[in-house]
UniProtKB/Swiss-Prot annotation:
GO cellular component annotations of the record: host cell nucleus
Subcellular location: Host nucleus
Described function: Initiates and terminates the replication only of its own subviral DNA molecule. The closed circular ssDNA genome is first converted to a superhelical dsDNA. Rep binds a specific hairpin at the genome origin of replication. Introduces an endonucleolytic nick within the intergenic region of the genome, thereby initiating the rolling circle replication (RCR). Following cleavage, binds covalently to the 5'-phosphate of DNA as a tyrosyl ester. The cleavage gives rise to a free 3'-OH that serves as a primer for the cellular DNA polymerase.
Positions bound to ATP: 172-180
Subunit structure: Homooligomer (Potential). Rep binds to repeated DNA motifs (iterons).
Protein name in UniProt: Para-Rep C10
Catalysed reactions listed for this entry: ATP + H2O = ADP + phosphate + H(+)
Domain CRESS-DNA virus Rep endonuclease: 3-96
A GO MF term: metal ion binding
Alphabetized Pfam families for the sequence: RNA_helicase, Viral_Rep
The keyword NAD is assigned to this record: no
C-alpha cells in the first residue's frame, strides 16, 4: 500500500550517557519529549508536523529513533509527561494546534441542520455532503478479489516513496482489465484523489481543495487522446498548482512528492510529455 504519511508521530529514542540534543526544523509545528528510564535510558516524545510527512522523512529528522503514527495526539502528549518513569523534562517546542477542530465544527453544523447550511452556503454544503458520502462508501467497500499481475506491480510501485518526476501510466487497450475499478478502489483510501479528467481549470480547482493527495486520473475510453491534459498532470507532479477558477491562487508544495497515476486505453503522447517521465504498466 502507499507510503505511510502522517502529521502526528510518537517517537522513542534510546541512548546511553549524555542526553541527545534534539534540533527541530521549521517543518515541525510542535513537539514534547522527556527523559525516561525503565530498563534503559530513552527519550519519549510526540511530534506534530505542519503537513503530512512520510516515515522516511521523519527518520531523517530524528535518526535512530523508533517512530509510529500517533492516532490519538492528546493521549500521546499526556504519555510523554507521565511521572512514573520520568527522569528529566518534559521539554516543549512550538505551539500545538488542535487539528481537525474546524472540520469537526463544520460537520457538526451540517449534522444539526443540513438544509440551513445548504441555503446559507451551498458550496460548503456540497463539500460536507461529499465527506459524508465518502465516509459511508469507505466503510462498506473492500478489495475482495485476487490481484491481477499489473495490479500487484502497481501496488508494489506505490509502496515506494514517490519521486519528483515519475508519472505512472497504466495502459490497457481493450477494456475490461480492471483499470477503473482499481482506480476507484485506490482513491477510497485517505490521501488519494480521483478524477476522470475534464477541463484543466476544473481539475486544478478540484485538486487545490486538497493538494497534498496522491492522484489517480482515470481517462474514459470516450475521451479523445488530444484532450488529455498533460499540463495538469505535470503541474500536479511538479508540485506547483496554478488554480485560476473562482479564487485564483498558486499552490507550491515543493519537496512533498506524490504519486500520479494515469489509467488509459492508449499510450502517452511523447510529443506532449517527456518520455523519460513515464513508467508504463501494461495490463
Amino acid at each position: 500500500m502507499p507510503s505511510i504519511r502522517a502529521i502526528h508521530w510518537c517517537f522513542t529514542l534510546n541512548f546511553s550517557g549524555k542526553i541527545p540534543e534534539i534540533v527541530w526544523t521549521a517543518d515541525v509545528q510542535y513537539s514534547i519529549w522527556q527523559h525516561e528510564r525503565v530498563n534503559h535510558d530513552h527519550l519519549q516524545g510526540y511530534i506534530q508536523m505542519k503537513k503530512q510527512t512520510t516515515l522516511k522523512k521523519m527518520k531523517e529528522l530524528l535518526p535512530g529513533a523508533h517512530l509510529e503514527m500517533a492516532r490519538a495526539p492528546k493521549k500521546a502528549i499526556d504519555y510523554c509527561q507521565k511521572k512514573e518513569t520520568a527522569i528529566d523534562g518534559p521539554w516543549e517546542y512550538g505551539t500545538w494546534i488542535s487539528t481537525g477542530s474546524h472540520k469537526r465544527k463544520l460537520m457538526e453544523r451540517f449534522d444539526e441542520d443540513p438544509e440551513e447550511m445548504k441555503l446559507e452556503d451551498p458550496g460548503l454544503y456540497r463539500r460536507c455532503l461529499s465527506r459524508v458520502q465518502m465516509t459511508k462508501v469507505r466503510e462498506k467497500n473492500s478489495w475482495d478479489y485476487d490481484l491481477r499481475p499489473w495490479q500487484d506491480e502497481l501496488l508494489k510501485t506505490i509502496e515506494q516513496e514517490p519521486d519528483d518526476r515519475t508519472i505512472l501510466w497504466v495502459y490497457g487497450p481493450h477494456g475490461g482489465e480492471g483499470k477503473s475499478v482499481f482506480a476507484k478502489y485506490l482513491t477510497l483510501k485517505e490521501g488519494w484523489w480521483y478524477t476522470a479528467g475534464g477541463k484543466a481549470t476544473d481539475m486544478l480547482y478540484s485538486y487545490s481543495l486538497d493538494p497534498t493527495c496522491h492522484v489517480c486520473i482515470d481517462i474514459p475510453r470516450c475521451t479523445k487522446e488530444e484532450y488529455i491534459n498533460y499540463a495538469v498532470i505535470e503541474q500536479i507532479k511538479n508540485r506547483i498548482i496554478i488554480n485560476t477558477k473562482y479564487e485564483p491562487c498558486t499552490i507550491r508544495d515543493d519537496g512533498h512528492n506524490v504519486h500520479v497515476i494515469v489509467f488509459a486505453n492508449y499510450l502517452p503522447d511523447v510529443t506532449r510529455i517527456s518520455e523519460d517521465r513515464i513508467k508504463i504498466i501494461y495490463c
